[in-house]
């Protein structure tokens, strides 16, 4: 029996039952504890479909998805925090109000408990300088960091990040990467990215997707060896036919 926090077996997803095409087809995916698992693929490869299924946004057309032992959508959602490519935040609130609200809504009882959780999220995401600012006044980089802090306040075992570095400048991206590495000491992190170097530097394991299917998976070295290439970029090009 698989003991990984995230187990996806024989996953198929079709949005339109009248069409033959699947958004994802026969996908098997596993993400372990205290690790970073990356999804690589071009637009339309099926990455977002798989991530949203893992986060409990939709059922599989066929196959099974288990997150921390839960296979029903409510159970999955309780165990996953989803960080979208474009932050979805209440911009009328201050950062402080937003994070305390998220911590309280996530079942953290008592003001001391909420404070400890929020303090940790603020420290990891380096938000002290904007803690009292309104979300509406923040830059894209800070919005992404607040979105990540919000996911930390949910206290879930699994954090799913869809194209987290999109639109960030190199300095902001480097900071977010450090935060992800810190989180992975106690969490299961799953992320999608277009950037080969990002996956190579961050991920314990990578899955390369093309046309809704997994072309290859393993450590970076394993994927490179399997493809017969010299590096991950060459392996990606060969495996996806680009």
Residue ranges and their predicted role:
Residues 100, 104, 112-130:
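Conserved ABC ATPase "signature" region
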Residues 217-218:
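ABC ATPase "signature
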Residues 159-163:
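Catalytic Walker B motif of ABC-type/P-loop ATPase nucleotide-binding domains
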Residues 55:
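Helix-to-loop junction immediately C-terminal to a conserved catalytic motif
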Residues 62-78:
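Conserved ABC transporter NBD signature motif
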